[in-house]
Amino acid sequence: MAAIRHLPNTIWALLMAFSAPAVFAAPVVSLNVEPFSTPLEQLNQSGSCRRCDLRGADLHGAHLIGADLRDADLRGANLEGANLEGADLSDARLAEAHLQGATLTNAELSGTDLRRADLREAVVINAYAPDVLTEGMEFAGSNLTGSHLIYGGK
């Protein structure tokens, strides 16, 4: 190696690199995670929107199967025809929400505020709903088979 020390630095560095023992480094991973710009974007991309402010949101016909909407504020939201099968709506505020024809099969509704909500023709099979606020709730034509709705007061 001493005989080739007169080579330019770049070539010298290459020769040294190939004659040196290999060193493997772990790859560097950069996570540039951008925060969601809106609660709707968060819900659409992650399926989770705990404590989100979705008041008056238009979620008509949305596919929210298994969504995590615990403590979300959905007052006055349009969820007509939405599929919320298996969704967790524990302690969510759905007062005056429009849920006509929505599917809430196997949904978790404990502590949910459904006052003056419109659940006409909704499918609420096997939903678990203790301490639900139901004053003025409309549910004519709804399928409540196997659901446990326990009125929690006003």
Language-model features: where?
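Tandem repeat scaffolds
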Residues: 26-154
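Bacterial N-terminal signal peptides that target proteins for export
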Residues: 2-11
